[in-house]
Amino acid sequence: MTKTIPTTLRISLPIIVLMLLQIGRFQAIAEESNGQLPNIVLIISDDQAWTDYGFMGHPTIKTPNLDRMAKESVLFRRGYVPTSLCRPSLATLLTGHYASTHGITGNDPSPKYAGQNTEKYQNQRAQLISKIDRFTTLPSALGAKGYLSHQSGKLWEGSFKNSGFSHGMTRGFPERGGRHGDDGLKIGREGLEPIANFIELAEKQDKPFFIWYAPFLPHTPHNPPERLLKKYQTADRPISIAKYYAMCEWFDETCGQLHNLIDDRKMTENTIFIYVTDNGWIQDPTSKRYAPRSKQSPNEGGTRTPIFFNWPAKLAPADRPELVSSIDLVPTILSLAGADVPGSLPGLDLTDAIRNGSKIARKQIFGEGFAHDIADINEPEASLLYRWCIEGKWKLLLTYDGEVNRYAWTHPRSVKGPQLYNLEDDPTEETNVATAHPDIVARLGQAIADWYPVKKRKTVPLSINDRP
């Protein structure tokens, strides 16, 4: 006699399966929380194009250590940073919020309104640093879960303690040389001893650890070791390009050294390595500086980055096609550490996606760009230059009339009206197809407006290169 499953039970089976999967996920996190919490290493390169890795297909630059890690990772090739300038981008990684929310929109107060050596300017710098005090930073939140944390490399928001780290290298403003890292900028370029000592300390105290590794690499000065520079020097390659390529490999070497520090102590099985860059960079072949449409710009050369999660013991390698953003890293790291994820964070917790391969339930990501020099410390919108939205293959870019001051050459703002690009067919954003797709412009434009309203700034209808 054939037995049939009752209809109600047949309908319930998929729900039961989903519930069991979720229970399994939360049990796994609970086991880590009640047992051994994972160590977390956040690797942040400084000024590197999304194309400039072996695993991203660069034909010349050698990055064997990151290639190996990426191969063993959940890799998102379409990662982005919301803001393509180091200080606001790093502040997003510390707070989990967009620059328009955390208020650290540029690197420095504008010298237009107060000379850099004046008391007024120094007070503005201090006021800018104090904005981080309004947030529970990522290292602070992890500290509440029992983590020790170590800062090395670039840090703008005062000393390492001011940003919530238990240990670190940066002394911070107002000490001499305290603009964006001071002693912390030695990491990588002068070895990794401070990190090695910290790992040893955490091991002795039997504490989980969080490492913020944000070396001044491949950032200028482009002064790579001669042994690396020779590999990239050719008769037909500009020396500025060769130096930049060598800097990328030098950075990769330090990532391998960092991985070895943990592997040699047999900690790799319980350590998550996460990779992102702070902003992009396209090397100018004729000078030491970056080319247009890269750093500080809202274009792919400024905002796009690979993002990967490397934890072979727990995460199956995968090459994911979805859009992700550095805005997602704080909620994801907190979740992986078994900590509460505040509902106020705008990013997504990617834990299910990287653990279980589930699809990411998001259609659009957003970004914004501000001037390097902050026109008004208390009004982020005063320096607003760009907002953008990506949905699938489409990218809408809107340009605003915020004040630029220095670096005007980086922000020509000469394109009339909205810019729409088909990134699938035109990844370098050469052809503006806005007039051919007014419906897409309207839809994504409304999405940007819904993201947050602009009160004073207006979109740029024509060239305002000389206007504030």
Regions flagged by a language model, labelled:
Residues 28-38, 45, 49-50, 75, ...:
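Long, internal low-complexity/basic segments
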Residues 37-49, 68-69, 93, 142, ...:
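Beta-strand elements within well-structured catalytic alpha/beta cores of enzymes
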Residues 58-90, 96-101, 143, 148-150, ...:
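Short, structured active-site-proximal loop/turn typified by the sulfatase FGly-forming signature C/S-X-P-X-R
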Residues 61, 260-318, 325, 346, ...:
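Histidine-centered active-site microenvironments of extracellular/periplasmic hydrolases
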Residues 97-197, 292, 402:
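Catalytic-site neighborhoods of secreted/periplasmic enzymes
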Residues 192-199, 230-271, 336:
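A long, amphipathic alpha-helix that forms part
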Residues 195-244, 279-292, 439, 467:
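Active-site His/acidic residue clusters
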Residues 281-287, 294, 315, 322, ...:
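C-terminal cap/loop subdomain of S1 sulfatases and analogous C-terminal strand-loop tails that border
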